[in-house]
């Protein structure tokens, strides 16, 4: 017996040297593994099983692999118990039997084997071979994470991110992602980047987020490529580079990434550098259609917009409505807003303002900013029946919370909410809050907000000088809308709040005409001022 033990140890040592060499010499290792395995060495039994499972140094032989794993597993060797469990779970070389897999994982996990703890956790998480138990899954991930098992650290991070089996905690989730990322777990690298981008469990850090996305992208991760592309597309955390964005989106698209398809389609739709070729319409539609065919609802909706507008495809309102309904049925709020606008304008359907409002409110409840504005505006103006100012304020305030100063609907909604507070419409009258909202909308580029703020000071607060400054700010910071230019022109004409200056009044009236667009009131009043001054239009 002592001689057998010594011989087993010698052969096992020889096999380990050959197997663990750089590079491994599998063909030379297998005979030594067989000899030591025949003497019952568990490491050699398990390792020889692995060689048979993957055809390393010997022919691929799954039944033999299972038999060898079982020999070592029966001797209590955790790696073999784990490998045997994986064969049972995946049905590799045998009929799938997750329950039998769970049996062997329980044995290995009880001995503290990290991989088994992790894999058993996935079974409890999904309810495969065992009764679903999210708390048990999280505990098992925690046990393996404590031992430094990267996949478990990542999975535990997901548990804390989503509140799955544990109380939701973004800080702990980020910590686990960082632990796994430090070991090169690419999905964890990406998730950590997302947390830094969104400010989850830490302060927002767009630069750090872009760096992590770049790390994931360099490893070939399509999520990382898509998110890094978005950073370059928007100039978030990196210098804006539309061409680089297009390149990265394309890399992710080549891997079948649906969000990248959608975003790249928009690059072509907007004709940005790198996506501005003569065939850009065809490419945009092709990408929208490709993503839509795989169930990406944003692309379903935007393909509908292409059909509604006849952009890149023949105009087909019936097809547009079909696509909008498909996306709306799947809960896409933007599609609900599109259906509302079709009902409002009578495009493809008979005009129905009540149906339009219903769709707008559905989209608003889903968080779509355009739908929130449209619902609020319909209710504020009573376009679908009796006005409901309180409900209008509700949707304007929901829109305000989204903090989207780059969106016209947001700027207009904040201005309109200011109007509600100014006049006590659907909310208690509050000039201070109205001023704050007007300033916020104005600073985001809304000309009417500066005009309304000026009017409030001119009419309610009887302060023409302050009104003039607000009008002036609107003239200087906003390039659309002639209201501020006209109002300031009238103050200069009459010497109210400013020193009378008819030349300045004429100059501003002409600017108001230039910016008026189709605003008939501004055109009429600016023309009248020029006529009074005997000036050319």
What positions do the PLM features span?
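Terminal, low-structured helical/coil segments at or just beyond the last alpha-helical repeat
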Residues: 2-3, 513-537
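Short helix-capping/linker turns of helical repeat alpha-solenoids
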Residues: 6, 39-41, 54-56, 75-77, ...
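Alpha-helical segment of the N-proximal tetratricopeptide repeat
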Residues: 7-35, 39, 50-53, 158
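Hydrophobic face of amphipathic alpha-helices that form TPR/SEL1-like repeat modules
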Residues: 14-20, 47-54, 83-90, 119-126, ...
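Canonical positions in the second alpha-helix
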Residues: 35-36, 71-72, 107-108, 143-144, ...
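TPR/TPR-like (Sel1-like) alpha-helical repeat modules
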Residues: 471-474, 499-517
């Amino acid at each position: 017996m002592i001689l057998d033990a010594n011989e087993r140890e010698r052969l096992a040592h020889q096999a380990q040297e050959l197997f663990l060499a750089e590079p491994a010499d599998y063909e030379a290792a297998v005979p030594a593994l067989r000899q030591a395995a025949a003497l019952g060495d568990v490491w050699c039994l398990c390792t020889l099983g692995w060689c048979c499972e993957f055809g390393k140094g010997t022919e691929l032989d799954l039944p033999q692999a299972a038999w060898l794993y079982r020999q070592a597993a029966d001797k209590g060797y955790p790696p073999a118990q784990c490998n045997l469990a994986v064969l049972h779970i995946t049905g590799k070389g045998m009929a799938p039997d997750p329950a039998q897999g769970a049996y062997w994982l329980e044995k290995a996990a009880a001995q503290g084997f990290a991989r088994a703890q992790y894999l058993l956790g996935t079974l409890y998480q999904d309810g495969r071979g065992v009764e679903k138990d999210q708390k048990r899954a999280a505990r098992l991930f925690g046990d393996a994470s404590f031992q430094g098992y990267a996949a478990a650290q990542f999975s535990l991070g997901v548990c804390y991110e989503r509140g799955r089996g544990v109380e939701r905690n973004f800080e702990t989730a980020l910590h686990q992602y960082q632990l796994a990322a430090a070991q090169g777990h690419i999905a964890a690298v990406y998730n950590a980047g997302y947390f830094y981008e969104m400010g989850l469990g830490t302060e927002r850090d767009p630069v750090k987020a872009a760096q992590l996305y770049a790390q994931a992208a360099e490893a070939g991760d399509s999520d990382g490529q898509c998110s890094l592309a978005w950073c370059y597309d928007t100039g978030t955390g990196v210098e804006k580079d539309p061409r680089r964005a297009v390149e990265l989106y394309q890399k992710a698209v080549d891997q079948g990434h649906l969000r990248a398809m959608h975003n790249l389609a928009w690059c072509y739709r907007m004709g940005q550098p790198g996506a501005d070729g003569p065939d850009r319409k065809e490419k945009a539609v092709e990408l929208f259609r490709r993503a839509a065919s795989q169930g990406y609802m944003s692309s379903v909706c935007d393909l509908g917009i292409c059909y509604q507008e006849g952009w890149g495809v023949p105009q087909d309102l019936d097809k547009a409505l079909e696509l909008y309904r498909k996306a709306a049925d799947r809960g896409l709020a933007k599609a609900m807003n599109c259906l509302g606008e079709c009902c409002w304008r009578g495009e493809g359907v008979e005009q129905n303002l009540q149906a339009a409002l219903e769709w707008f409110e559905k989209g608003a409840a889903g968080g779509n900013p355009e739908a929130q504005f449209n619902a609020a505006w319909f209710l504020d103006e009573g376009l679908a029946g009796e006005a409901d100012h309180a409900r209008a304020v509700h949707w304007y305030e929901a829109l305000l919370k989204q903090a989207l100063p780059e969106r016209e609907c947001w700027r207009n909604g904040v201005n309109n909410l200011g109007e509600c507070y100014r006049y006590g419409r659907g909310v208690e009258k509050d000039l201070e809050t109205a001023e704050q909202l007007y300033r916020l909308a104005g600073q985001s580029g809304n000309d009417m907000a500066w005009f309304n703020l000026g009017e409030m000071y001119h009419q309610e607060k009887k302060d023409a000088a302050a009104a003039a400054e607000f009008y002036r700010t609107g003239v200087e910071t906003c390039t659309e809308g002639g209201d501020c230019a006209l109002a300031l022109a009238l103050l200069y004409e009459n010497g109210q709040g400013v020193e009378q200056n008819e030349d300045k009044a004429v100059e501003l009236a002409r600017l108001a005409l230039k910016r008026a667009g189709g605003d008939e009131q501004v055109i009429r009043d600016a023309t009248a001022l020029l006529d009074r001054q005997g000036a050319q239009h």
